[in-house]
């Protein structure tokens, strides 16, 4: 099984941004732990602060990943284009926060 994780704006600052709210662990540390705990799953990870790059990544992996876990950050509330990209691909997309 292949699971792709996509994080949107400001999620590159996890571990640094408001640690009292979001914790002090970087996403890369969490991602490395996830790969160790589930070695039978192929994980890949992408993060961007740019809406178009998130859409390009959805198009790129949206026909090969079994599941996409998407935390689009603030774009969850504002991006019609990301919603359209999700509708255009075959992979299952689960929105996470």
List where the protein language model places each region.
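Extreme N-terminal starter segment of soluble prokaryotic enzymes
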Residues: 1-4
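Glycine- and acidic-residue-enriched helix-capping/strand-helix junction motifs
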Residues: 13-28
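A generic structural motif
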Residues: 39-43
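Short beta->alpha junction loops
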Residues: 44-52
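Short acidic active-site motifs
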Residues: 53-57, 78
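Short, well-structured alpha-helical segments in soluble
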Residues: 56-64
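Mid-chain, well-packed structural core segment of small domains
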Residues: 66-97
């Amino acid at each position: 099984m292949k699971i792709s994780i996509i994080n949107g704006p400001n999620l590159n600052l996890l571990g640094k941004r408001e640690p009292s709210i979001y914790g002090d662990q970087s996403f890369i540390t969490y991602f490395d732990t996830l790969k160790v705990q589930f070695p039978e799953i192929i994980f890949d990870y992408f993060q961007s602060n740019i809406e178009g790059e998130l859409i390009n990544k959805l198009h790129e992996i949206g026909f090969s990943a079994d599941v996409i876990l998407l935390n689009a950050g603030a774009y969850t509330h504002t991006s019609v284009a990301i919603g359209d990209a999700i509708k255009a691909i075959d992979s299952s997309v689960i929105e996470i926060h």
